[in-house]
Amino acid sequence: MKKTILILTALFALTAFAQPPQLSIENFAPIESQGAFPAPLKRAANTPKSSKEYSPFLVSMLKQGRIIYGTEMNEYLDNIVEKLLVNHPQLQQEIHVYILQTPIVNAFSLPDGTVLVTMGMLAQVTNEAELAFVLAHEIAHYSERHGKDDDSKAKKGDVVSRYMRNQKYSREQEFTADRVGLLTFYKDTPYSYDILDGIFDVLLYSDLPFDEIPFQRSEVETDFYHFPDNYFLKTVANIPDRSNMIDTLLTHPNIEKRRTLAKGLVRNLPNDGRKEFVQPQEQFTRLRNVARFACIDRFLINHDYDLAIYNTYVMEQTFPNNAYLRRAKATAYYGAAKHKASGQTTTFMEPYRDVEGEQQQLNYFLTKMNRNEYAVLALRRVWTALQADPKDEYLQNVAKDLINDIFVKNKMKFIDFCDYSQGTTMEEIAQAGGDTTRPAAANSKYDRIKQQNMSAKVLPDPKFKAVNYMLVDIHSDSLFKAWVNDAVVNAEMQAVLSYVQDKKIGNETSMLIATPIYLTYNKNGQIKSLADDKRNAEQLQKLMCRALKRHKITPITFDMDFSKPETDTYNNFVKMRQWNADFTNAGGLDMRYHTSEYLDDIAAELGSRKLCFVHVTDSPDRAYFPSKIFLPWLIPMFPYSLPVVVGVMSLRTHEVDVDFRIIDVVDGTTEASGHYSRQEVMRKAYVNGYVYQRLEQYVRK
């Protein structure tokens, strides 16, 4: 008896150990893969491109670090698949389900049996049975051999969006997948048929936020300041009924036809005893919330700050004191302020006229604010988050960066921010016993510094607007005053400090070299050759390593060896890729990157906190040919110049853009940066020369 108990105890312990850790929103962090690296993914990553088994989309997603495996979410999906394939042992061996890290609502079936369910789908479905239908549909695509995996038409933009555009199934294939999925796989499960309306609604409105909640003015205003009424819409655009929309305008076409046919297929099938949930409903709700947090994190990486702000606002209605949401909101407002300051308004949000529903109020408000209002509102958000988490180094660095933007770059002064609520009169201040004496004008930087340390409160001014009242509750904070003083004083010494910092940095003995992103496009905006781009990136990385070695600095390259993959290495690789995406989406902005802290562990492990990253785009310039310059000189020498004329006319310049950046991955600061953009014929040589020169300049300092 005792032996039996010991065996059962041991088996229970082994089972518990084998289970992935439970995902939680209380201490949410970017989701990492768990367990052993899956053999199907290893096989896919190492399949030769010449093979019929090669899966370009899967390999692309894997090498971008977008695949998640081995987590509690994956196990939840596997349990559903097990029920769908209970009578199909062969398919049980062939189907492998993974999660694709993107907020886009979709799922994909690939020819090798891989099924990818997006994080966006997990965030939007309303019950487990809806997920079962989605998986049954994708498995049917595979069993009916509908799958195709072709990235030859890849264009600029998010690779998942491109794949969705290029890989749409025909109407007949979609209908077949619904029929086979329902009658061959879904029918064998205990899941309810009543969910069909729900899942087709999820697909029909897949571009909408997690929920529709009015965006209240109190979200961006307080009792002591108010924006003008014209910063807000009186009514927002209603979300129209999409059931009669033209299919080509929808992300998921044929929805209404599919809905009608699917409901017809199961109309006469018994539904008694079938359920929306087979696994615990509480687990589904928790995992869906985790998926929503993960989508918000991806919005931040993509710099889709309007989506990040609104969806964070939605989630805060349920989790009002969540540390991650508080930080995410601060990050989103900060990122929006940095883009606004650089004039890149359209890069971080959709035009409000293109937005439907309650989110339109937010986008309209973001459209109305000026750069000072953006910066100060962002500072308010960051300061609030910092009060709750005072040891958060990222928030500290972001707050200091915003203070520098406000008081140095935007040239606002400490006395530009009132200590009294908007609308307070001098009479009210006097009646309350306050001092209504105005300080003398500050004519020098020393006067400004002294005024910032004065105990006298800043009084209302007829010229003040809402922005001048936005720091009432922060203005007298001793830490805030100290950071403002530091920003003002340091601005006067910036050149000296920069030199000192460069000297210190120049003494680094090692540097991380991220694999460059090198993208070459043809005249139609399509990627010419991923293989050529990879080769160019590898050659550029080798050149960067040589430049560092010349100065006895050890280059540390970090890439993923998929021939011997390990999960810990893959998770670090994912973090690096997320940072790459964050950097690229910033468009060259000097800002504290949301993903910088992801690299802290990598920096500690590899022994360097400096990271050099290069992003290159190479596109044909349709408007410029070198022949325009040379032909007038060559025509008089015709016909002797004919070979030269033909050669010159065959040359076509390319528009080359190079972003060069050296980042301190611990505090997120940019140590060196450069941007190169011009029309070139011999562009590869110029790119290599520019990057080599920038590294030389950096290390010689």
Model-derived features with residue positions:
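Bacterial Sec-dependent N-terminal signal peptides
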Residues: 1-26
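A Zn2+-metalloprotease active-site environment signal
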Residues: 19-499
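Start-of-domain marker
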Residues: 33-40, 69-70, 499-549
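Active-site-proximal beta-strand/loop segments in catalytic clefts of secreted hydrolases
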Residues: 100-102, 119-120, 199, 514-517, ...
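Short, solvent-exposed beta-strand-terminating loops
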Residues: 145-150, 333-340, 558-564, 618-631
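Short helix/strand-bridging catalytic loops that position acidic/His residues to coordinate divalent metals
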Residues: 157-169, 527-531, 633-635, 641-643, ...
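C-terminal/domain-edge helix-coil "capping" segments
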Residues: 174, 478, 483-523, 601, ...
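N-terminal segment of the mature soluble domain
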Residues: 524-617, 665-669, 673-675
